[in-house]
Each structure stands twice: as C-alpha cells, then as structure tokens.
C-alpha cells in the first residue's frame, strides 16, 4: 500500500480560532514563507500588486508595500517564489485597458526577503487586445536552479477563443526567459489558471481549469516525469486527468490551487458553485500522486449570495495547511489540519 493512501475519511478540519483578516479589500492573495521564518502575503488591491509581512506566523500583518503598478489598467494575479539564492520573485499579469499597452507577464525581485522591490524582467508579451491576452502566472524552481513559469495564453490563437497553458524557463534566476512552449492544450477549449507543484517523487503536476466537459470549468491535473519534453497534454492524453474522484456534475471548478504536505498528501482547492448563487472556496485531499481527491471541506463561511474568490493554499508547517480567499470584504486566512 502507498505510504500516503487516501481514504474517503480524509478531509481538512479548519480551526476557526486561527481565522484572520490579512487585508480589508483585495483579491488573488498568495502566501510564502521566506528564509528567516517571516510569511509574505501578496495580493491585488486597486490595480496594484501589494505585499504584507507577518513576523508571528500569520497572526498579525505589517502595513502593505506596493511592489508593482501597471502604466495602464492593473498589475493582477501576483504570485511569489523564493529562489535558492534567497531572492524573492513576484510574478504579475499586466492588464492594460487603453488599447495601446500590451498584456504581459512581468517579474519583480526582492533581494532582502520582501522588504524592497524592483522590476526584474519582462517574461512574456501578448497582444493589446484583451481577447488575445496572457493571464495568471505561477512558478516553481527545480533543484537544478531552473525556474519554470506557467501561465494561461490566448495569444497563439488570435483567430479563435482557444487558450493554452504556456511554459517559460529561466536559467539565470529570472533575468531572461526561454521561448514559450505549450504544455497543455485541448483543441477548441480554454485551459486556464495553472498552478504547478513539484511532487515528492520529483515529477511535476499542474492544476488547471478545463471547460472541455461542459461550459463550466472542471479541475484537471497535468503531469510530467520528463520535464515537459513531450508534446502538450491534449484532451485525450494519459498525462492529464480529472482531479476529483467523484465530481459533482454541477460544480464549477474555477481557480484551482495545489500543494503537497510533507507527509505526502496533496491538497487541492478551487471555487465551487454547488448550492450557491456565487462560488466559494472548497478544499479536497488527494494522494501522493495528485489523484483521488476526496473529503470536500469549506474553510470559510460565506453567505450563499456572496462570493469567495481566487483562493490559494500555503503549507505553514509539517501538519498545517493555510487557506486564503477573497471573501467577506477582504483577504482572509485560516489554518487547517488533515484528519
């Protein structure tokens, strides 16, 4: 039997005593722990990418620092990655609204653990037309030092509504980037919102949203054991599977996020619309291979006519997973444990 075999009884128990508002207002929040122990939380607020710091393990948060602002429109979808050399990269999606500036994936860097920031590189440039844009960057660093940056990309499909998941590689700590490579594409559909995770067996998975089964999105896992050297995983690829073992047919699986616990379990979150007027964040527990997700739990209490948007997950320690969501008027976080 696998060391981390998941049963129907596994779920997350959320500790309401840990519930904290990180920021009043704001959206698309993500957390990392930097060397030294502080936690950083990045999020979008009034079109800018901001970062707040916690020195007490997420109980309280210092005043926000502005990392990036777009010349037109917004600096959206911020996501952080601490590199092996100690730098912290913040990736964001420049979303213009003037018909002049391009949609881009930009990178900012902090060399002092998130205290000060400067622009680092332009990773990708798409069109000025929002129908041919690029969206939602997220990244990992391999043990070799290679950075892999994933994002949703309409730009290669100017004559259709299709979208792929694109990979860029950097071998110099994010200063320069490779040519784009498609790693996931279902013809005629829209793969979106990728979140990568390096598993304990050194393979890589990417949680994405996929509207290939119905007009609603479902969460899919795309997998590689050869560092994405194969053609993109299409709708029939064995390297691509539905995440939820027993999906609810009417469940909208937007905005996925995935992490792996030190004990091996994979934790998956996404936005669910089941029994609601607007979606909320739900969380499932999977096995060590990012399969067989079960044990649906709801970390935040949100009125059914209000939304819980753009959730994420943070492995706080060996036994604690933190859920973060934009709900109830702000960016909220809560700790949970597998039971």
Region spans (language model):
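Asp-box/BNR beta-propeller blade signature and adjacent active/binding-site loops
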Residues: 4-339
């Amino acid at each position: 039997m696998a060391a981390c075999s998941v049963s129907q009884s596994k779920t997350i128990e959320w500790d309401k005593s840990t519930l904290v508002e990180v920021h009043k207002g704001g959206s698309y929040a993500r957390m990392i722990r930097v060397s030294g122990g502080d936690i950083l939380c990045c999020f979008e607020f009034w079109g800018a990418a901001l970062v707040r710091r916690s020195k007490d393990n997420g109980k309280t948060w210092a005043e926000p620092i502005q990392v990036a602002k777009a010349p037109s429109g917004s600096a959206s979808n911020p996501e952080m990655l601490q590199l092996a050399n100690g730098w912290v990269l913040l990736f964001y999606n420049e979303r213009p609204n003037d018909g002049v500036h391009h949609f881009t994936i930009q990178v900012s860097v902090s060399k002092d653990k998130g205290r000060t920031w400067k622009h680092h590189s332009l990773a990708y440039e798409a069109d000025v037309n929002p129908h041919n844009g690029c969206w939602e960057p997220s990244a990992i660093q391999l043990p070799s030092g290679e950075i892999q940056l994933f994002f949703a990309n309409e730009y290669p499909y100017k004559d259709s509504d299709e979208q792929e998941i694109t990979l860029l590689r950097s071998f110099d700590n994010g200063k320069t980037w490779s040519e784009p490579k498609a790693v996931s594409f279902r013809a005629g559909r829209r793969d979106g919102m990728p979140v990568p995770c390096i598993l304990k067996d050194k393979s890589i998975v990417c949680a994405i949203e996929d509207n290939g089964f119905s007009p609603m999105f479902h969460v899919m896992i795309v997998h590689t054991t050869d560092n994405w050297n194969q053609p993109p995983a299409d709708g029939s690829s064995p390297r691509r599977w539905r995440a939820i073992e027993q999906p609810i047919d009417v469940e909208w699986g937007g905005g996925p996020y995935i992490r792996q616990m030190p004990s091996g379990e994979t934790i998956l979150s996404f936005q669910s619309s089941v029994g609601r007027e607007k979606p909320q964040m739900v969380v499932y527990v999977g096995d060590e291979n990012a399969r067989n997700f079960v044990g649906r739990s709801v970390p935040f209490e949100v009125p059914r006519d209000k939304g819980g948007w753009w959730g994420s997950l943070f492995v706080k320690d060996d036994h604690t997973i933190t859920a973060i969501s934009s709900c109830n008027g702000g960016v909220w976080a809560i700790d949970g444990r597998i039971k």
